Amino acid sequence: MEHYISLFVKAVFVENMALAFFLGMCTFIAISKKVETAIGLGIAVIVVQTITVPANNLIYTYLLKDGALAWAGLPEVDLSFLGLLSYIGVIAAIVQILEMLLDKYVPSLYNALGVFLPLITVNCAIMAGSLFMVERDYNLAESTVYGVGSGFSWALAIAALAGIREKLKYSDVPEGLQGLGITFITIGLMSLGFMSFSGVQL
């Protein structure tokens, strides 16, 4: 259990998708203007990561990696070159299902997220979760914990940035830095804060 807690904490703070690896910056900046919308997208990312990382782990373990098809009598077959296509397919399917559910049950959030909800499919933070899982050779349980942690890390970062940006609306920001200028500086300062976790050994 301690191993899984360490993996979760490491995924959230030490290896934060947005503030340590700078992944998913497009949606991270565009949707972080309001806290409610940012939290909604953050929850969507958590759900997608929690499902896709372990699902892609199963696909890689039992279908794609070298020797994975031994159960089917094909021990020499290596389909790992199909990894990227498979992961994108799984992510696209999960995002499509999530999009339909939000449209039906939470239309206000669906409309607020707009084009950025289907763009989760090509959000590099989502793909990175599956690629890191393969690179680090996680098992199914580790993949599930890592999926939750990596999704939560991105959600935490976007919610924090949205809160800061809402406060900045009422701040006296120099004219040349208003808008994206102060946002980039804020992200950099947040990233410096998260860098303090980089020396933590878990």
From Swiss-Prot:
Subcellular location, record wording: Cell inner membrane
Record's keyword annotation contains Repeat: no
Major localization class: membrane
Record EC number: 7.2.1.1
Residue ranges of the TM segments: 11-31, 35-55, 81-101, 114-134, 144-164, 180-200
Highest taxon of the lineage: Bacteria
Catalytic activity: a ubiquinone + n Na(+)(in) + NADH + H(+) = a ubiquinol + n Na(+)(out) + NAD(+)
GO MF annotation list: oxidoreductase activity, acting on NAD(P)H, quinone or similar compound as acceptor
UniProt GO cellular component terms: Gram-negative-bacterium-type cell wall; plasma membrane
Keyword rRNA-binding applies: no
Subunit structure: Composed of six subunits; NqrA, NqrB, NqrC, NqrD, NqrE and NqrF.
Protein's recorded name: Na(+)-translocating NADH-quinone reductase subunit E
